[in-house]
């Protein structure tokens, strides 16, 4: 009744599956359209967490890690096939992403250096199946996450521990006009791509 339409459950595998198998049906009985997304990094447990009621699981140690390797480490794209085949029976329940609060920004010096270099990986993530794709705030603008902000320091991520401005989103917001006038040409091109 608060308008929440989903829960992203951080490190869900650290909580016993029995709990999720009990709580998720309780919530869905009252709010049948609510989504539960789990962060589970052990592929051997994926099917168990889906059976416990989760709608989607982060595909971090499969598709994310591999797409990052192709994008920034010159891995062969041929291995992408194995990544989706490993979860083919549950692929519609795997959430693809290229950035999140735990991972370094694509445009950071720790990953790729430019947001545009991940366009091929984003096309793969968005078109390989019917499963959802997450775009992290600022990813569509090439946010670098290269500030030495607060607790986390300069690590190529946008801090989640401190009150901090996301430069690309501030440029897009343009002092409350929300017209993107503060974006540079590369940011505009990337936003058009997304």
Residue ranges and their predicted role:
Residues 1-49, 53, 89:
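Active-site neighborhood of glycoside hydrolase catalytic domains
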Residues 5-14, 61-73, 103-114, 175-178:
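The substrate-binding groove and active-site-proximal loops of carbohydrate-active enzymes
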Residues 20, 24-25, 84, 122-125:
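Short amphipathic alpha-helical segments and helix-helix/interface helices
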Residues 25, 49-61, 148-161:
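Aromatic- and acidic-residue-enriched segments that line the glycan-binding/catalytic groove
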Residues 31-39, 56-69, 160:
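Acidic, His- and aromatic-enriched active-site or binding-groove loops in soluble protein domains
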Residues 43-46, 75-86:
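Alpha-helical scaffolding within the catalytic cores
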Residues 50-54, 72-77, 112:
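Short, surface-exposed amphipathic charged segments that create phosphate/polyanion-binding patches used
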Residues 79, 88-100, 105-194:
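Loop/helix patches that line or flank the sugar-binding groove of alpha-linked glycan CAZymes
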